[in-house]
Amino acid sequence: MPSGSSESPADALRASDSTPDIKPRSRDVTDGLEKTAARGMLRAVGMGDDDWVKPQIGVGSSWNEITPCNMSLQRLAQSVKGGVHSAGGFPLEFGTISVSDGISMGHEGMHFSLVSREVIADSVETVVQAERLDGTVLLAGCDKSIPGMLMAAARLDLASVFLYNGSIMPGVAKLTDGSEREVTIIDAFEAVGACARGLMSREDVDIIERAICPGEGACGGMYTANTMASAAEALGMSLPGSASPVAIDKRRDEYARRSGEAVVEMLRRGITARDILTKEAFENAIAVVMAFGGSTNAVLHLLAIAWEANVKLTLEDFTRVGQKVPHLADVKPFGRHVMKHVDEIGGVPVVMKALLDAGLMHGDCLTVTGETMAENLAHIEPPDPDGKVLRAMNNPIHPTGGITILHGSLAPEGAVVKSAGFDSDVFEGTARVFERERAALDALEDGTITHGDVVVIRYEGPKGGPGMREMLAITGAIKGAGLGKDVLLMTDGRFSGGTTGLCVGHIAPEAVDGGPIAFVRDGDRIRLDVAKGTLDLLVDEAEFESRKAGFEPLPPVYTTGVLAKYTKLVGSAAVGAVCG
């Protein structure tokens, strides 16, 4: 995969003989007679005469008490600020929002999840631009807050380091039959489906509910948060090794301190986010996501981050990289292990080194350490894959990456499937069409969804949903009902990083834009071929065209508020569902 290009960004920066200004922006609020009022305000928050020469570093955090995913961030921010101080900068902490997908799943609240990514990016940009901060350390721990922070870093193009909250420890459920197993939040969604079909008692559901979240941290499997934290490390925007330690691990405080030091050093070297966020860096991130069999949401988020970085990244890049990179990690939701176990065998650097040694990563990409990815790995000397949590390159779980991009008559602009969970390449079945998720859940609860059905849920796209809701409630219920290998679900919405089963999402164009999914009818035959990367509606072309006559999409659900604005601005999932 390395391109063999001439001078890398790291080489170019090292060759520069200019001395960067470590206060490229904050002079606007600290220097000169006319800034008297601004300095007076800054004195009130702790700055003094000796601090006006220091770079001002924004420490932006999505800390809140609503979800365990972000609870460590308040503590970590203190360590970040200590690192900034010790390196000669002055930290200024500020907050932004975060939405818990685990709490907002399966009801109206999920409409607001993806839009929170844009709100986070916009709010960070607003604070940093208004206050003229010189650099940032951005802390997050949840599915949309991680890409939102990275989008902000890419948009601002300042010295910036990302720091992850860390994941939760697995819980232990002791069930009524005497069995004991490790559980994560995904087990709760699947337990609901099993209970609804009479396959699990309410008592066991209650036991699982009480066990799934034993403390603070993001959901523990290779779901969206851990996937995006791993991607951030592979991009070079986080310190090497920082993605995998769990939230309660005190190594996180050291990573936080070093992140604060690193951003000041980036200013001294003149390194900004877009020096790191190159096309090659995104290919590295895609490679790591593919090797982990990570969340399909990474496709959406990496496209959006690249868009903010002014890097041309397309679905075809995911296909190209995914065809070369094997699926190595036996991690949840399809495997047996969680991020804690990945950390125990060396963390994300183990995967990165294995891919680098195989020629599947660009080792010359610059990172927030000021060194290249290859140099970072040489310092760490990560071990080889252990063979259980992470397979060796010559013994992969699948020979190609865990995510496949689809095209075809049902998805002219593209769709995404987590192929890591497929036992066979082809599924052909009969369409059962539902307008939005609730109708499909009702049918499943009624027992009318059966083997061989293709459940089509439409008007759940970025614009038509709005907000491109995740379908974890329905997919968890399908698996819990014992239909996970026998029913295909396809939607213009999204899936949770914890989704398992036969699921195709991000279908574009979406229904509200008159995409082919809008014209599927009950009883139509649909064919998915993962090996060929195709998703097709097996309907005569003339019949299909006749269905388009007089098409009227469903009216918008929201006509006021943030989602009404979002509906007017958001683009296709095929380009990251960005608001450009």
From Swiss-Prot:
**What's its top-level EC category?**
lyase
Instruction: List the keywords (alphabetical).
Output: 2Fe-2S, Amino-acid biosynthesis, Branched-chain amino acid biosynthesis, Iron, Iron-sulfur, Lyase, Magnesium, Metal-binding
UniProt binding sites for [2Fe-2S] cluster:
C69, C142, C219
Task: Identify the pathway.
Answer: Amino-acid biosynthesis; L-isoleucine biosynthesis; L-isoleucine from 2-oxobutanoate: step 3/4; Amino-acid biosynthesis; L-valine biosynthesis; L-valine from pyruvate: step 3/4
Write out the ranges of the annotated region (Disordered): 1-31
Residues with the N6-carboxylysine modification = K144
Domain of life of the source:
Bacteria
> Any idea of its EC number?
4.2.1.9
Q: Which InterPro entries match?
A: DHAD_IlvD/Edd, Dihydro-acid_dehy_C, DihydroxyA_deHydtase, DiOHA_6PGluconate_deHydtase_CS, ILV_EDD_C, ILV_EDD_N, IlvD/EDD_N
The record's disulfide annotation reads: none
GO biological process assignments: isoleucine biosynthetic process; L-valine biosynthetic process
Gene Ontology molecular functions: 2 iron, 2 sulfur cluster binding; dihydroxy-acid dehydratase activity; magnesium ion binding
Q: Which family does it belong to?
A: Belongs to the IlvD/Edd family.
**HAMAP family per the UniProt record, alphabetical:** IlvD
Per its UniProt record, what PANTHER family does this chain match?
DIHYDROXY-ACID DEHYDRATASE DAD, DIHYDROXY-ACID DEHYDRATASE, MITOCHONDRIAL
Subunit (UniProt): Homodimer.
The protein's name in its UniProt record: Dihydroxy-acid dehydratase
Q: Which organism is it from?
A: Mycobacterium sp. (strain JLS)
